[in-house]
Amino acid sequence: MGDEEAPSGSIEDRINHKNWKWRVSGLEELTTKFRNSIEGSGPLFNEWGPQFKKILADINPMSQERALEPLSAFIDRCDCVNKFAASYVGVLVEKLFASTRPRAKEKTIECLLLTIEADSAEPVVEALLKGTSSTSPKILLASLAALTQALKTFGPKQIPVKLILKQFSPWFENRDKGIRDQASELFIEIYRWIGKALIPLISEALTPIQLKALQDQFEKLPTDPAVPLKYTRSEAAKALANASKGIQAKPEVVEEIDPYSLMTAVNILPKLTSEFYEGLQAKKWQERSEQMDKLVTILTNTPKIETADFSELCKALKKILADVNVMIVQKAVVSIGLLADSLRGGFTSYVKPFITPILEKFKEKKTSVLQSVHTTMDSLVGKSISLSDIIDELTATMQSKVPQIKQEVLVFICNSITNTKKPADITKVTKQLTKIFMEALNDTDSNIRDNASKAFAALGGIIGERAMTPYLNQIDPIKAKKIKDNMPAVATPVTITPQPLAPVDLKDIDLPVSSSNKKPAAATGNSKSSSTTTPTGRSSNSSPLPPPPSSSDDIKNKLIGAGIVNNEIIEGLGKTQWKDRLQAVDDILENVKGLTADSINGMSESIIQLLCDKPSLKESNFQVLSSIFSIFIQCCKNDSNFTQQRCANSYLTTCIEKLTDVKLKEISSELLFSTGESITPHAVFTSIYQFTSNHKNPKIIADSLVWIQQAIDEFGIGCCSNGIQQLKPLLDYTKQCLESTNPDVKKSAIKLLCTIKINIGATLTDFLGDVKKPTMEVLDREFQKIRDQKPPVPNRQWKGMPPPGSAPVQIEFPRVDISVKLTPAIITNLSDANWKTRSDALDEIERIIIDANRKIQPKLGGLIPALKNRLTDNNQKCTITTLNIIGMLSQAMGGQSFEKHARLLIPGILLLLGDSKKPVRDAVISCMNVIVQSDLGFDVFIGSLAAPMIQESAFTRKESLAWTIVNVTNMKAAPIPSEINTLAKGIISCLQDKSAEIRSLADNLLSILCTQIPLIEFKKELKHVKPASQPSIQTILDKYYQKTGQPIPPPSKTKQSTSSSSSSSSTTSQQSSTPSSPQPIRQQQQQQQQQPTQPQQQQQQQQRRSILQSNNGASNCEFIIFDINGKMNRQKTNQIPSWHFIEPTEEVVEILQDQVLQCFTEEFANLMFSSLPSNSQHMSDLMIGMIEQNPEAIISVLDILFRWITFKLFDTGLASQKRVLKILEILLNKLIDSEYSIGEYEASCLVPILLEKSGSATNEQIKQIFKQSIQQLEELCLPNVLFRFAIEMVTSQNWRTRVEVLNVMASIIDKNGASVCGNLKVVIPLITQNLNDSQSKQSSLLCLNKLYSHIKDECFKYSNISQQDKILIIGNNNNNNNNNNNNNNNNNNNNVQQQQQQQQQQQQQQPRKSLSTDEMSTQLIGCLELLKNYSITKENIEHTVEALKQFSGLMANGKLDDVFVNFAEEYFLVLTSILADTFPQVSKDATILRLCKYLIHTIISILSNKVVAKQCNVRCLEIVLNETIKLYSLAESNSSKQGTESELSKAFNQILLRILQNCNSTILFSTLLQMMSRTDNDQSIQHPGKYNDLLLRCLLRATKSLTTPSILEELNVETVLSEINSFLKSNPSLDEITRKTTKTLTSELYQNRTNQVVKFTKDIISKGQQQKYQYLLNLLIELVPKQFEDLINGNGNGNRISSGGSNNNNNNGGRVSSGGNNNNNSGRENINNININSSLDSPINDHHNSNNTTTTTTRSRTSTGSSNSQQQQLPTTSANTTTTTTTTTTTGKTQSTLSTLKINKEPRDYSGKTDSQKKELLIEIFKKIGNKDLTLDGIHDLYFFIREYPDYDITPNLNSSSQQFQAYITRNLKKIKDSMDAPKDKDDEVVNYQERLKVIQNTFYNQHNQPSSQVVNNNNNNNNNNNNNNNNNINNNNNNNNNSGGNENIAPQLSNTASMASNTLQRLRTLNPDQNSGSNNNNSHQNSPSTSSSNDLNSTVASLRQRLAQLTSKSNE
């Protein structure tokens, strides 16, 4: 062959290639691509990032190791490693650490360290900690090494030590010394960082030796503080920023680990018994002291106590504090301190009552007591409460007259202040403490004064010297000096610098603005000229309108001339028939729509006057009036001269009034909107005020308020707030409506005020001061609900509206002083160590600004410095929130006020441009844009922009350059040269960057700023550039500057171009013409640079979303935001269990709108919520088109679409409901066609409200549509899901809804059976409640009737139903049955014969049977579907249990047997799968245990049905056997098996027994053999050894049953033999046990079906299939002697088939002799006495199974006589038998033999017993049966007892044993009865004696411990000797007997017995040589007994009887 093909193709193909060399080639190229990548993100990284998990899992070690190289390059270049780290770090730990490659471990650790450096430490630490718990020593050792290296490199800030300390104990207990040493190295590294704090954390878990060894290593460590060897990327960027500012890096502060957090809480209350509390109340102090000692001991030994109710203990301790015995009091104080240490925060609520009593104990003289009190108080204040919590108690105690108390309290306060970790708690009570100290300083006791000075000094260390000055000035100078002297000596753990009072600045005061400083009115859009314009919005110089026509004739003539009307139309307007009027109006509408804009100008007034005359606005027909309104709408939209006075006033009042008309509401609303667009909305509002203010119809007022609210949303608040003068009438009108008594009016007014509040903010409250207090409280609650809402974007405009570019018109609200709300606590919390506290403080500040309506005074106190510190916060959320607050402040304060703060904050903001997290950079850009858009403009940034450009960070440079290019044009004034010249340094630095993109951006910025920055500034910076880079930069400078230093003027002829884009020279000239506002030259390039700053998700959404086209355009655009996982994510985060409400609230609408915007484009979402009919119809058309064209997209948003449909069902408009229901109908039909199944979550979004609305619908057409939709849902939803939602609605307040729901439930039950109902105990009472309601009673009866038809009288058990109702329920059921069964007897004539009547009856029964079969199938399918949708939730478990109950009830009816067979496989599959899923949790949840029991019971009940079991196929049995044996193995393998698992093990055993007993034997053997063939390849088997053992036991048990005639009849021997051959073929190398089991099965088949086996074998040979059945033939040849081959070769009856080398002749057919024994076989054909040993389980051992030992016994076969012969049991004593027997265990054989020897078959005398004696006797009998050595003897006792007392009930005694053992007892009783009742034959004694001889032989050979070979040799020798002497005589005798007839068959048996006796006697002599002389028959081998010598036989038998008695007694001993 030639050389291997060189790798080629794409990287993807090579990496996925099967050849590892190709994969390595692909990995090398991928590494190169990563290293050459300039970008840190993009398609390359997004494509390959997720694939490293698969690449690293390569099975080839070489390829796997080489995969680390591209991973290393990927991590080095990628900016978003944290997005992919979690996917590959686990593979690194699991696969690469276990690699066999020498350097794989080191490279893997390098990759993990690189990942941590890329700010992705969390997944790495998690994976490594998981690796430390691995069972593989290699992975464990490498994980520990990686943790050590990571901690050493990055420190505990990135590698949390706390997580390591939670699981370190097993490392030091590992047997591998390397692991223990590596763990020691890890802890040495931890000690480097946290020092001695580590020792108490590990002292309890380590042995003293290990701890001592570690401490020795700790002492050797250097004392220098540990520092990380590397920074992460984010830390490096901050360090670089600090370095550029000259800020020194601070040493890393290691988080202090509290050992308390690692401890396990213990509940101590159970230890405090009632004796403890009684002892505390004892009179003797010794008893009280003893109990307190006990409490102290418990608390001392419990460092962490579980939180519980300690109120009783605290009450007892409080009483003890008042005890007279000081020592007991001291112990109580100590106990309280220990409780505080152990409970900490959990003890806070109990502390207060103890404070004063404990403080009073400071008066005690004993030092130990004082020390205990101090310790306890320190514990209370440090662990449970703060000093500020007990300041009142301290103040009261300081009023004590005992000096010692004051002195000690001051010492305690000083210690608390000095040791505090929360200075803020001290600052809260500064005033109270200073008051205490100043009083104590004046005390007469010097010790009190000294302690007060120290405490005062400690307080000064907290609040600072400046804050102390006011207090010190009030004190005597000498005392003040003493305090100052003590202050430096006091430790100040935390220093808080008080904020100095800022000097008063005029800029901080709001002054009235003089008129000279105001901007021109034209600029604001609020000039007086605008307020004096005409209402039409036209300017004063516009041409006046022509005068209107004066008469109606002129109007008609004018309109006829314009072609709008004709005489026919005018005549039609006045006709009495509404259809004629409607036709005329529709003609006018068509003509108006056809007019152009120029044609309709000036015609609107005439049209309106014509229609107002005829048919007039009082038209009674709504269709005519609707068309008139449509004409008015066209006039409003198309006539530019439309005015209010001449046009709108004619119809406005009528239009407002028609808002209440359901049929005209939509068109009236649309007309008002169109009118507002033509004449300002404010004019429409004014008309509403005037018309509705005093109107008597409250509905008109309410609907008008609703329309105003919609108008504000669609036009914006500007439509009514051009000044406070226009807003005030609206507010006055709304407040007037608030006083209305009508709830609808009041509710609408509140909603309108909420809308205004959303738009204008908190200032609205200023206008509501005169509102009544109760109403105001309601408003406040509503305002609280909408506080986070933002005003919607206006989508309508009116004529005269300010252009979009102009400044929005706003109401000037007063600025709010928020300095009062910015409390010191909030400012302090901004610096808290806990990020959540900081985040909460920032959120509170943001809330304060929002509540102030973003109009605040520039009085911020210490907020700005605190915000500056938060810009460098480690938490991303805090940083983003800080940036948002800064942007809000710039807008809320105004540009001039915020300027000084901006210059302080901007440097920190710009540094964040280099943050590696995209959200942070986006927030920075957004904040900067907001600042620029304020009055400050770009100017405030100029002096700070150079800093981010100088940094060596690609992010910082790119973002700062791109932003500067875009915003440099927003400068408000000419830049200051000193500031803008600083950009020269930044531009020069960026021109040297390695990134071409950054250099291009810098070039672009230089082209803009070349006119602002002189060349000399660039020359200065060029000197610091490397000489190699200077020429390229100089070339760029030469492009924009002349040699004289002046900038080159922009070219006017040519176009300047760049590598990416170009712009025209004319544009450049125009842009550069104004130096104060320079424009960028490369606009396209700027746009490209802006794109990376936008969030990537937004870009993708913009690409996916397409703007909806107008009504006149195409409508087939995509409007669904397709997300394949969106529905799943919404289901997980769903917070509303059931989408059901009586009326949609604001919260519901808000939730729905947010969800719709997530799934649909914004334009389409607006259409979905539009109230205009045109928009709604357009939306409906688009939706229906999408449903037809792209159902997949619709299904992805099906839940939200269902919710929107239900929301729209609440519309009052009939047309709107029809549109929505049409969408629903089409949607459901499409889902049915697609065979889609609606899940429970999707159904919850639709079904509840649909059911509710189906009852409330009044329109018949709508009601029918609802019913049709529910029928469609019955096809789409699972019946139990639909039923569950229906049962929830059955309690509805609307009786119509209840009726519809009950009908739906009846339909579901009728179609699917009662199993869909779930828990009948809950369902039936809910249904029966409606029996008391007259409206819903009929439906309730129908539902109960359907239920009764399935479960009969069971439905009456769960509720009290009256007898009358029961009759109705049952009667309805009977009527239904009678209606279904048509009786045709009335059609028969009297002369019809009886035979014809019977035929007719048979014909009538046929359809009934088929119907019954269909019903049963439906019921079974219903139960099956319920089980298939099982999931492990409590509710579903109950449904499943109920379904199983229903199924068991169905199976109890024997009619289902034949039908169930068709579903058996599916049922078994579902039942076993549920059982397998739930079994692992059975010990954790009682509900799951209950479910498992029902499942097992169901399976057993199925298999107990013999009709079903016999028809189960191989697949059914395989399903049940596989799962049952798996679970049985799992239960048995649990070493700590509990009662539950033991009980389930028995249940699994019952399943196996039912299969073995009831299933078809052929199918059973086929299944078992096939399963044994597949066992080795099944990876799902957890315990294969146990699994195989159980399979073999099942096969053995099935083999035993082959002696049963019924099983033999159904057995197909050919099939079983074929399966045996297949099994042997697929498993050529079997273990000994399996092979022996296979032999046993084959031998049993041969013994019981010899003819069929022989025939099958002959057929194989005749067909030439020996090769195919080679394995079976080999087994038969092995089992059967060599003569078997002669038989199957066709030798016939004349052949001799012998074994063991004996030569025997048979003249009467073929005879078989084995081992020297010759038996006559006249009853079987050919061959039947070849004895083959089989290993079978003893039934006694099955019951007494203590060691699961399988006992091998020798079974003798029975032979059947030809005509008059009887069954005989033949002995088997061949060498083969002996060999097989000796291979079994001695213990099992001995037990079986002893139990056989102890059987007493003699009759018992149990007559004359009393009842009590009978009971006792029966107990003793069953005890004997329970003894495995006396079982059979006990069964004989039981037989004679039953024969004596046949009427006595022994069932209770039988039930005490297992079902298996009961069956065993029953079988043996039957055998005993049969044997007793059978006639006694002459050969019984011989046969029985023969059996006894066999038992004795086998027993004693085993007892004498002879080797197997010796036993076999002895047997063979003895048998050969005896048989050689006796064969001739026996053969001759046999020949004679064969000719004499069947009555002389005893002779051969006597001969055989004599031979056996001789053999036995010889063996006994061998075993007992000392007794040979005493035996009368010691030479029996010389004189063998003959059949003709009865004397010799008798003497031999007598001798053996005597010997038998001796040996029996010996064996018993």
UniProtKB/Swiss-Prot annotation:
SMART domains, alphabetized: TOG
Residues covered by region (Disordered): 512-557, 1043-1109, 1372-1413, 1695-1809, 1905-1949, 1966-1995
Signal sequence residues: none
One term under GO cellular component: cell cortex
GO MF annotation: an example: microtubule binding
Swiss-Prot/TrEMBL HEAT repeat ranges: 115-153, 158-196, 200-238, 348-386, 427-465, 724-762, 816-854, 857-895, 899-937, 977-1015, 1240-1279, 1281-1314, 1317-1353
Biased composition (Low complexity): 524-543, 1053-1106, 1372-1406, 1695-1735, 1746-1796, 1913-1939, 1967-1995
Effect of disrupting the coding gene: Mutants exhibit a disappearance of supernumerary centrosomes and multinuclear cells, and increased sensitivity to the microtubule depolymerizing drug nocodazole. Mutants overexpressing mtaA exhibit supernumerary centrosomes and a cytokinesis defect. Mutants underexpressing mtaA display inhibited growth and a reduction in the number and length of astral microtubes.
Keywords: Cell cycle, Cell division, Centromere, Chromosome, Cytoplasm, Cytoskeleton, Kinetochore, Microtubule, Mitosis, Repeat
Location(s) in or outside the cell: Cytoplasm, Cytoskeleton, Microtubule organizing center, Centrosome; Cytoplasm, Cytoskeleton; Chromosome, Centromere, Kinetochore
Residue ranges with Polar residues bias: 1940-1949
Organism domain of life: Eukaryota
One of the GO biological process terms: mitotic spindle organization
Feature: compositional bias, Basic and acidic residues: 1799-1809
PROSITE patterns: HEAT_REPEAT
Family affiliation: Belongs to the TOG/XMAP215 family.
Function: Involved in regulation of microtubule dynamics. Regulates the interaction of microtubules tips with the centrosome and cell cortex.
Subunit structure: Interacts with eb1 at the microtubule tip, centrosome and kinetochore. Interacts with lis1 in the cortical attachment of microtubules.
The protein's name: Centrosomal protein 224
Gene: mtaA
